[in-house]
Amino acid sequence: MDFKVADLSLAEAGRHQIRLAEYEMPGLMQLRKEFADEQPLKGARIAGSIHMTVQTAVLIETLTALGAEVRWASCNIFSTQDEAAAAIVVGSGTVEEPAGVPVFAWKGESLEEYWWCINQIFSWGDELPNMILDDGGDATMAVIRGREYEQAGLVPPAEANDSDEYIAFLGMLREVLAAEPGKWGKIAEAVKGVTEETTTGVHRLYHFAEEGVLPFPAMNVNDAVTKSKFDNKYGTRHSLIDGINRATDMLMGGKNVLVCGYGDVGKGCAEAFDGQGARVKVTEADPINALQALMDGYSVVTVDEAIEDADIVITATGNKDIISFEQMLKMKDHALLGNIGHFDNEIDMHSLLHRDDVTRTTIKPQVDEFTFSTGRSIIVLSEGRLLNLGNATGHPSFVMSNSFADQTIAQIELFQNEGQYENEVYRLPKVLDEKVARIHVEALGGQLTELTKEQAEYIGVDVAGPFKPEHYRY
């Protein structure tokens, strides 16, 4: 079995953590019981790219328990929990003779190593992957752009304004084109569908669909209610504070905090800081979200207006160029800057890392002080990447049980219903969304009210649901 992780000797520690996480992930454990005999993913060869955490380990072993074969990489260079990666590789075997799942992930990958790992999840020897499970869209992008450049016969050269990450991506595609011509086209034809975990990846999917280059059906897991309204908000509310505490031990009470973005993730950020006693301001482009922030009690400002007074600045937009180098120069001495959007381009990290008039001092892994020519400095977490995974271990198990149950159900839906979906982007059917919610309500001891037949008819629903129309916003 091929794999590449940091240290297989960490497998026992990882297994203990996985065992504890299983008790906090009732959605996945229920799916294992429900589908144990049916094996709905038998024959599925899943190329998986999600943060290689303890919670993801429970997802991987759920997929294999339902019959799938899996190869896995992380979707972030800093997010891997090395003990979890080791435990998944060892599986039911030993450190000397591992018998688990091929994993290609370790904490602190270089950009070149990251894209090498992504390529490995698509390398199945004589077979081809037939499903993709993605977070952020990098794996899907590799197939789509890889096929495009194969057809052109050339991977284009990097342009002057391309990010270091995109340059590394093109380098990987160039190497594959030389060594394995035709690889990506074959994979594009073999894949039955992709399920996408996060907002950024979903934006990419819709873009590919609009371009007419999406070669297989896609399931938008992010916009399942049991994902976006729970993982994005409640998970962030927990893991953001965890990441900052582990990174800096900074007291948040009384501090001025600027949260950029007030979507579901931004709402979780603002609520988390508010709960710590911080004074929170929000930036937002969407007037509806801005009005929500105001009604929730937060000032709505612009970055330029608020950044000079902020002790902590967090980006949560899923967009690019949110905090410029010029704005960083205006920040307080030793102010904290972090990001909880999927990519590192919300903050102008390129200037921080490449300008001659900026000095970088690493305080500890994923905590860096950048000193400007003025003598002032700022503290940046995880090089502008997801701080809750780079500086901590991500969202708690229970909330990830929601998201990963959605992922598992979406994989089953696409794999078993080949031909019923066009090469477009779909959302998880609401009846399945409600199924995931029901499992977790019961796990928390909640008692659901049962409608009478007359009540159900009165509001135009079935007694067993779904209870809301597709357009309902919750």
UniProtKB/Swiss-Prot annotation:
GO process terms (BP): L-homocysteine biosynthetic process; one-carbon metabolic process; S-adenosylmethionine cycle
Metabolic or biological pathway, per its Swiss-Prot or TrEMBL entry: Amino-acid biosynthesis; L-homocysteine biosynthesis; L-homocysteine from S-adenosyl-L-homocysteine: step 1/1
Coiled coil regions in record: none
Cofactor: NAD(+)
InterPro entries: Adenosylhomocyst_ase-like_sf, Adenosylhomocysteinase-like, Ado_hCys_hydrolase_NAD-bd, NAD(P)-bd_dom_sf, S-Ado-L-homoCys_hydrolase_CS
Chief site of localization: cytoplasm
Signal peptide extent: none
Membership in a protein family: Belongs to the adenosylhomocysteinase family.
Organism: Corynebacterium glutamicum (strain ATCC 13032 / DSM 20300 / JCM 1318 / BCRC 11384 / CCUG 27702 / LMG 3730 / NBRC 12168 / NCIMB 10025 / NRRL B-2784 / 534)
Gene Ontology MF: a single term: adenosylhomocysteinase activity
CDD domains, alphabetized: SAHH
Catalytic activity, reaction form: S-adenosyl-L-homocysteine + H2O = L-homocysteine + adenosine
UniProt KW keywords: Cytoplasm, Hydrolase, NAD, One-carbon metabolism
Binding note for cofactor: Binds 1 NAD(+) per subunit.
Name listed for the protein in its UniProt record: Adenosylhomocysteinase
Record's function text: May play a key role in the regulation of the intracellular concentration of adenosylhomocysteine.
GO cellular component: cytosol
EC class of the enzyme, as a word: hydrolase
Electron transport listed as a keyword: no
